[in-house]
Structure formats: C-alpha cells, structure tokens
Regions:
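DNA polymerase processivity clamps
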Residues: 4-112
Length: 112
C-alpha cells in the first residue's frame, strides 16, 4: 500500500448505520471526510447537491480531505476495521477479528 495519509478505526455499528441509509435512500456514494477536526463517514449522492445526506463521526484528524467510494464497491463482511486512506486513491480495510482485508479504489475526484 502506498503511504497512508489517514488512519482510523471503523466500528461495524457506524458502518451499518450509514449502509442502511445509502441502501434505503438509494444513495450511490459514500465519503470519508476530514473537516473541523473530525473524520465523518457520509452517505450521499455527490452528483446531486439537493439529495439527502447523512453522516456519522468515526474519528479525529487535523487534515482536510474527502475520499469518495462508490457504495456498490463497499462489499465487506461485517466487523470492526482499521482503515487507511492514501493520496494514491486507495482505501485499505483490515478486519480486526477475522483474517481478511480489502483494498478499495477511491474515486478520481477524491481530494487530500
């Protein structure tokens, strides 16, 4: 994995609450956003500024960034994860209890 720009822990309960929203509201995107000292996991439609948007705080940071992932690409088994985001537009998810990890591409318009 290229240099890790941002690292944090993602609780299963936080991910599942956002997953429920993007599934029920048919939101195509999720984002990890670093702003005002917080890392937020956001369900949204980045192409429609009038769409619903919901977020949960998952960590703290001193960086400003937005890392977009297509919701359809978030096919991970339930569990708590250590997450690393890279400026090279890669997200790395490592399950804390099961020996499984995922590398998921970030969208091209992600910014760090």
């Amino acid at each position: 994995m290229p240099d890790k720009t941002v690292t944090f822990s993602l609780k299963n309960s936080d991910y599942e609450s956002v997953k429920k929203l993007y599934t029920n509201l048919s939101l195509p995107d999720i984002a990890f956003k670093g702003e005002k000292g917080k890392i937020k996991l956001v369900a949204l439609d980045k192409k429609n500024s009038n769409s619903n948007e919901s977020s949960v705080t998952v960590g703290e940071t001193d960086l400003e960034f937005t890392a977009y992932i297509k919701a359809e690409n978030m096919k991970i088994i339930p569990g708590d994860y250590d997450v690393a985001l890279s400026k090279a537009k890669i997200a790395h998810f490592i399950n804390k209890k099961v020996k499984v990890q995922y590398w998921i591409a970030l969208e091209a318009d992600s910014t760090f």
